[in-house]
């Protein structure tokens, strides 16, 4: 698998470097736009559990996280590739929400994947309305309101998805002119559920947190993973502080406080070189693991009273992570330069049933800080080193070990062994996803070694790393924990 020029050789040291990476990533997608620009379909098939139109919408919407950020300051850019790409998106948006167009995305139904992509579209409308809303005709604007309003009243999972509807309603009000009173009750209904996910120290679970084995909690798991931080909840909370400061000042203040608390612990999910600890589901989103720091910077949530919330620290955490992916991307991209389903190499065993070929482009959430001007304090600050770099100088094992009580984990760094790992004994996922036991319930996870997922029932197929495996019939069958 070839590296991708512009990403794999990228030093990721400043804003210009991130723009170069964005250009490289979206340029590979250009041949796969539909004639009406509303769909992007890569020339492979994964059998995701939703329809192909929704999968094509993923390909259209997910790069918007970066493209909208590029156009936050101005409706034009000097990069011709990104300018053309944005124009494609505007045309595609108009056609995708038009029920009379052949490339209509379809109305949003219960449990619909379209809900997920509505957040990225709403983000673009909120952040860069001059680029993504003002060019639309009155006819297209009406269709857009109808399509986004389709989330309201629909059944959604009890997890991070509720944020997608909140952002759709924010865009309806802030950009499309829908009165706040018409959407406020939908927003507050979703907040009533999301508030129940909150744990200690800024953490939030990705769904109701099972406290014990009492009746009535059988449908609940214990999941506090990258969805809690970078993929969804903390990420969306921070973006909410940007777009709802006057509408909901109390909640905005609370979310900023929680983000600062979370920042004091989340850095331990990464080693001193920026390598993340692979844990939980949806790892095919790859460098979206660092998106918490991109959103933190965009929200300007800095606090000089903590060493973990300064511009230099946030910049270091984010850019080190992107550099790590750049230097480990030789097998991440397909021959045409598009992202593959997998982690450090294409891997369908560890993917989810909701991963279409276009799904990996959620990785571009880590580029939302491109909305910040070149003279912003993030770009002007010097990168600060990872705290563990200083710890290793002292050769102090104890200072590299920390109990994170909220997610039931102990984060460890062994300076002599140069090993960064997590001991995790209390999380589990009850949703019927692929290999959830391997993704949540092993005893340990490491930034140096990917964990194995079972491919069959034989011991060699189970590959029980960080797992207790017991056989009562001379190896015919195995029970694992």
What are these regions (language model features)?
Residues 1-58, 87-92:
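Low-complexity, Ser/Thr/Pro/Gly-enriched N-terminal "stalk/linker" regions
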Residues 14, 18, 52, 110, ...:
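Generic alpha-helical structural element
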Residues 19, 23-33, 49-52, 63, ...:
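A structure-centric feature marking long, well-folded core domains of fungal metabolic enzymes
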Residues 38, 76, 157, 272-276, ...:
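Intrinsically disordered or highly flexible coil/loop and linker segments, enriched in small
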Residues 45-49, 106-107, 273-279, 345-352:
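Acidic, serine/threonine- and proline-rich low-complexity regulatory regions
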Residues 53-57, 64-74, 82-263, 267-295:
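Aromatic-lined, polymer-binding surfaces characteristic
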Residues 297-481:
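Extended polysaccharide-engagement surfaces of secreted carbohydrate-active enzymes
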């Amino acid at each position: 698998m070839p590296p991708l020029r512009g990403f794999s050789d990228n030093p990721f040291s400043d804003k210009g470097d991130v723009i170069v990476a964005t250009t490289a990533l979206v340029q590979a997608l250009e041949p796969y736009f539909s004639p009406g620009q509303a769909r992007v379909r890569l020339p492979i098939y994964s059998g995701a559990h939703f329809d192909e139109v929704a999968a094509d919408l993923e390909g259209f919407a997910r790069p918007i996280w970066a493209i909208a950020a590029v156009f936050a300051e101005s409706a034009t850019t000097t990069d011709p590739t990104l300018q053309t790409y944005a124009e494609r998106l505007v045309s595609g948006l108009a056609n995708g929400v038009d029920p009379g167009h052949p490339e209509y995305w379809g109305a949003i139904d219960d449990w619909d994947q379209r809900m997920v992509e509505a957040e990225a579209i709403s983000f673009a409308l909120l952040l860069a309305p001059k680029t993504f809303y003002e060019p639309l005709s009155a006819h297209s604007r009406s269709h857009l309101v109808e399509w986004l309003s389709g989330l309201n009243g629909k059944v959604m999972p009890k997890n991070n998805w509720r944020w997608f509807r909140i952002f759709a309603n924010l865009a309806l009000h802030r950009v499309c002119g829908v009165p706040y009173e018409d959407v406020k009750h939908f927003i507050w209904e979703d907040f009533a559920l999301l508030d129940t996910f909150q744990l200690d120290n800024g953490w939030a679970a990705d769904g109701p947190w099972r406290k014990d084995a009492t009746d009535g909690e059988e449908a609940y798991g214990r999941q506090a993973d990258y969805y809690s931080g970078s993929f969804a909840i903390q990420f969306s909370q921070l973006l909410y502080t940007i777009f709802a400061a006057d509408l909901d000042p109390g909640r905005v203040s609370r979310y900023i406080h929680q983000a600062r608390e979370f920042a004091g612990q989340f850095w331990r999910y990464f080693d001193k070189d920026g390598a993340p600890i692979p844990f939980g589901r949806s790892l095919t989103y790859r460098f979206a693991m660092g998106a918490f720091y991109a959103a933190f910077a965009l929200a300007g949530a800095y606090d000089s009273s903590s060493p973990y919330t300064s511009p230099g620290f946030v910049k270091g955490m984010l850019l080190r992570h992107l550099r790590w992916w750049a230097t480990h991307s030789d097998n991440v991209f397909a021959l045409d330069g598009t992202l593959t389903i997998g982690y450090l190499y294409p891997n369908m065993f560890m993917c989810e049933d909701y991963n279409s070929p276009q799904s990996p482009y959620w990785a571009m959430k880590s580029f939302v800080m491109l909305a910040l001007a070149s003279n912003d304090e993030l770009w002007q600050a010097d990168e600060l080193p990872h705290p563990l770099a200083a710890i290793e100088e002292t050769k102090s094992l104890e200072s590299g070990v920390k109990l994170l009580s909220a997610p039931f984990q102990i984060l460890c760094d062994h300076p002599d062994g140069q090993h960064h790992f997590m001991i995790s004994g209390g999380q589990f996922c009850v949703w019927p996803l692929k290999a959830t036991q391997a993704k949540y319930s092993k005893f340990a996870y490491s930034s140096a070694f990917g964990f194995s997922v079972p491919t069959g029932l034989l011991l060699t197929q189970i590959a029980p790393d960080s797992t207790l495996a017991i056989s009562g019939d001379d190896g015919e069958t195995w029970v694992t924990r």
